[in-house]
């Protein structure tokens, strides 16, 4: 697992350096550290979670700086923002097309790689006034942990109502 994380970090760092050169952006220590923290995670962290990961190594960094850097990553295409109107935005270093499963109870976001979902673009004839550039699908439901907790709670409620 550590080697895999290291490989992801190296790939993202090289991609970042290339994109920064093309866009004329400085490769600051803040950007590198935040990118490393994001690439090391596979749980789609919030700004607060990335901030907690880096605050010791980047003394004096603010949540606002972390937010701005993550938004910069999204705008230059080296990260994706996963928005959910019911919870905080989350960020993903994996920019290849994939979809998500979002738990409505705890907010956990899980990657869903299903090639059958990658060909759902509507027929071009129906899109006369719109060009689709990209898309992702989010399925909302309960993760296994919350589903189990919910089932246990329901059993307890049933057993309480039966006595």
Question: Across the structure, where does each feature detected by a protein language model lie?
Answer:
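N-terminal leader segment of winged-helix/HTH proteins
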Residues: 1-26
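Pre-recognition alpha-helix immediately N-terminal to the DNA-recognition helix
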Residues: 32-37
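Short capping segments at the starts of secondary-structure elements
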Residues: 41-46
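A short acidic, leucine-rich amphipathic alpha-helix
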Residues: 49-55, 66
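Basic amphipathic alpha-helical segments that dock to polyanions
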Residues: 66-76
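Non-DNA-binding regulatory cores of transcription-related proteins
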Residues: 76-163
């Amino acid at each position: 697992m550590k080697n895999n994380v290291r490989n992801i970090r190296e790939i993202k760092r090289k991609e970042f350096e290339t994109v920064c050169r093309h866009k004329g952006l400085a490769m600051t220590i803040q950007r590198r550290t935040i990118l490393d923290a994001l690439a090391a995670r596979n749980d789609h962290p919030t700004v607060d979670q990335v901030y907690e990961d880096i605050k010791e190594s980047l003394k004096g960094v603010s949540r606002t700086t972390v937010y701005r850097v993550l938004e910069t990553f999204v705008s230059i295409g080296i990260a994706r923002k996963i928005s959910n109107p019911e919870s905080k935005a989350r960020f993903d270093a994996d920019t290849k097309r994939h979809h998500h499963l979002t738990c409505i109870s705890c907010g956990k976001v899980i990657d869903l790689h299903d090639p059958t979902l990658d060909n759902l673009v509507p027929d071009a004839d129906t899109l006369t006034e719109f060009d689709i550039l990209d898309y992702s699908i989010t399925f909302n439901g309960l993760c296994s942990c919350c589903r189990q907790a919910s089932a246990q709670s329901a059993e307890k409620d049933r057993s309480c109502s039966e006595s």
